């Protein structure tokens, strides 16, 4: 997918870029696969902010995505490639021969009319989903499960991909987008190919208002807050933070401080840590 630039008619337009949406084939989603999506604005059930900088934004409907890819042995044909406001990747509507319709993440180079399949007997081609044990070493994959049957949890963002490096007993070695090498159960499924819409990372927002359309609120620096609101707050004028190292709003060290738990259960599955 290409990047569309704009004439500098205003300061906001001068640096703005968007997708050209050349791959999108329809602007009407499948109604049976839509669900209501209410605004949370970063609040929990008590009304307290648990995630900052969220709120507002355009109204959305949730698209029900098939991350499990468990419709084994039944071929499906790609009907449309669609935009999904809830994720960076595009989605593809699949019409199966038994009449069912499902959305999947649209891999790179997937086109309308192509046939896809799920299951251990599926061919190694773009869009097909198989157990990792059936995928050859060196294959590029996405939408990887961590537990069999739970549905894909890893490598789902636009342009991301992982690679199968080897097989060890009941585990398969997978190199993730971050560079981390991880053991995944061989019964877990993955989809062949790279996630599409790889130019998503090149988009420039251009103006503050466009971030608000996306539901993102401003990020205020701690140094301009009051002491009651942030460890960096207070002082006369532009004061130093008065700490040995920068702190989060909750008084924890930040900017380089490791936050991963020391004895996390999944550590034994990580063969090589991600790149710094």
Curated annotation (Swiss-Prot):
Keywords: Ribonucleoprotein, Ribosomal protein, RNA-binding, rRNA-binding. Residues 7-20 have a biased composition (Polar residues). One of its GO terms (cellular component) is large ribosomal subunit. Residues 1-20, 219-276 are annotated as: Disordered. GO terms for molecular function: rRNA binding; structural constituent of ribosome; transferase activity. SUPFAM superfamilies: Nucleic acid-binding proteins, Translation proteins SH3-like domain. One of its GO terms (biological process) is cytoplasmic translation. Belongs to the universal ribosomal protein uL2 family. One of the primary rRNA binding proteins. Required for association of the 30S and 50S subunits to form the 70S ribosome, for tRNA binding and peptide bond formation. It has been suggested to have peptidyltransferase activity; this is somewhat controversial. Makes several contacts with the 16S rRNA in the 70S ribosome. Part of the 50S ribosomal subunit. Forms a bridge to the 30S subunit in the 70S ribosome. PANTHER family: LARGE RIBOSOMAL SUBUNIT PROTEIN UL2M, RIBOSOMAL PROTEIN L2. HAMAP family: Ribosomal_uL2_B. This is Large ribosomal subunit protein uL2. It comes from Bacillus anthracis. The gene is rplB.
């Amino acid at each position: 997918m290409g990047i569309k630039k704009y004439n500098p008619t205003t300061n906001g337009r001068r640096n703005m870029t968007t997708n050209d949406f050349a791959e999108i084939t329809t602007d009407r989603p499948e109604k049976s696969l839509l669900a209501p999506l209410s605004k949370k604005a970063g609040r929990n059930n008590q009304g307290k902010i648990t995630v900052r900088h969220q709120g507002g934004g355009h109204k959305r409907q949730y698209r029900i995505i098939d991350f499990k890819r468990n419709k084994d042995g039944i071929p499906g044909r790609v009907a449309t490639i669609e935009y999904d406001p809830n994720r960076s990747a595009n989605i593809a509507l699949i019409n199966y021969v038994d009449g069912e319709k499902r959305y999947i993440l649209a891999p790179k180079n997937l086109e309308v009319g192509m046939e896809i399949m799920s299951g251990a007997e599926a061919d190694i081609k773009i869009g097909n989903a198989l157990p990792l044990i059936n995928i050859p070493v060196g294959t590029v994959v996405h939408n990887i499960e961590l537990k069999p049957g739970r549905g894909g949890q890893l490598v789902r963002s636009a342009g991301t991909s992982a690679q199968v490096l080897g097989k060890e007993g009941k585990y398969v070695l997978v190199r993730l987008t971050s560079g981390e090498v991880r053991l995944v159960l061989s019964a877990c499924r993955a989809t062949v190919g790279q996630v599409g819409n790889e130019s998503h990372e090149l988009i420039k927002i251009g103006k503050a208002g466009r971030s608000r359309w996306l539901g993102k609120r401003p990020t205020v620096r701690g140094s301009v807050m009051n002491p009651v609101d942030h460890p960096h707050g207070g002082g006369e004028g532009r004061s130093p933070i008065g700490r040995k190292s920068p702190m989060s709003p909750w008084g924890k060290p930040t900017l380089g401080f490791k936050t991963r738990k020391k004895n996390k259960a999944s550590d034994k599955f990580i063969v090589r840590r991600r790149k710094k």
